[in-house]
Amino acid sequence: MTRYNFDKITNRKGTNCLKYDFAVERGKPADVLPLWVADMDFPVSEEITKSLHAAVEHGIYGYTQPKDAYYNAVMNWMERNHNWKTEREWIVKTPGVVFALGAAVKAFTDPGDAILIQNPVYYPFTNIIRDNDRRVVDNTLIYEKTAGQSGDNGYRIDFEDFERKLEQEHIKLFILCNPHNPVGRVWTVEELQQLGEICLRHHVIVVSDEIHNDFVYPGYEHTVFATVDPRFAEVTVTCTAPSKTFNLAGLQISNIFIPNEKLRKAFQTEIDKTGYDEPNALGIVACEAAYRAGEDWLDQLRAYLLKNLNFLRNFLQEKIPQIHLVEPEGTYLVWLDCSELGITGEELDQFIVDKAGLWLDGGSMFGPSGAAFQRVNIACPQATLELALNKLKAAVDNLK
């Protein structure tokens, strides 16, 4: 068994890397330390590298389509790791989950229609809705900081508001995030059941973004929304990709599961309108290798991420108690409650950049309820995380 060294620091600068090479273009100092965008500072697994090397050495990168080995790897992964027995014809390939969200918005709603999301949430949800001339309706998650201090995440769904919004705003589409980015909730079967029943009552289609489904911390379990009830599967578009799990975002491949044939055809029609047909040749290779032989690497990675999370928690408690960790149940993106610093929104964002020298994701990006928060990516060597936390401590210590 290969032992992977996640402590090793890999220099990503000069690789056209969005995370490290575009600070100035995005209004940040050139020397800012980035822990923002959701990719990892770890090389991929040995199996993926070997498969890509073989494909590169072949030397021809023509038009490609996946065959049986690809689909079997994807379906076996979902059954093995997420207890979901799928069928090949359910799978629609897209270059990414955000691309798929846009296709779903156009396939299942009309301009002017309302689409419901749960802020604070991954900001492309809002952008995709508005950019396609639809209306954003927000079922804001309830946050109780005292719950988080006792070990609970602190976020929960306001189900009364959820159903009221569906009815009053004539919602056609709900975009679910499970696990939820950025707050880190992994929704329970009971919560998903309640959401699904409400959506069925109001004839709402669910697009479930489950791209972080392989990152769940001990004591929690990810449940595919479509598996909770066969009726839910008939109204659900489930979005998955190997990009977050195996650090393959740049290879642009995702797998969208749509059991309902009518919904699948409508979705595929929108994909066809974009002219997208053949997936990235190397993306196919990497995805198949990851799902076929990536579990050992992933198991080691999960253990390392847990160490990083524990390190972060202890550091904040001991050295920066003004910043509260919203205990994540899943994802390697951690939500920090900075409300005790007394600054929010743009002022907080600028403090993080100018005084701490860090590039995090400001909470306001995820919705108004995130103004006092910052999102930090802990998928990096622990030395990088420690450096970032020391910079943050120095800035907070000097905050007047």
Predicted feature descriptions by range:
Residues 1-19, 28-31:
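Conserved PLP-binding active-site segment in aminotransferase class I/II-type PLP enzymes
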Residues 4, 27-33, 38-54, 85-87, ...:
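PLP-dependent class I/II
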Residues 9, 61-63, 225:
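Short clusters of hydrophobic/aromatic residues that line enzyme substrate/ligand-binding pockets
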Residues 34-39, 53-71:
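A glycine-/small-polar-enriched, mobile loop at the entrance of the PLP active site in fold-type I
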Residues 59-68, 74, 157, 288, ...:
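Short secondary-structure boundary segments
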Residues 62-95:
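Conserved N-terminal alpha-helix of the aminotransferase class I/II PLP-enzyme fold
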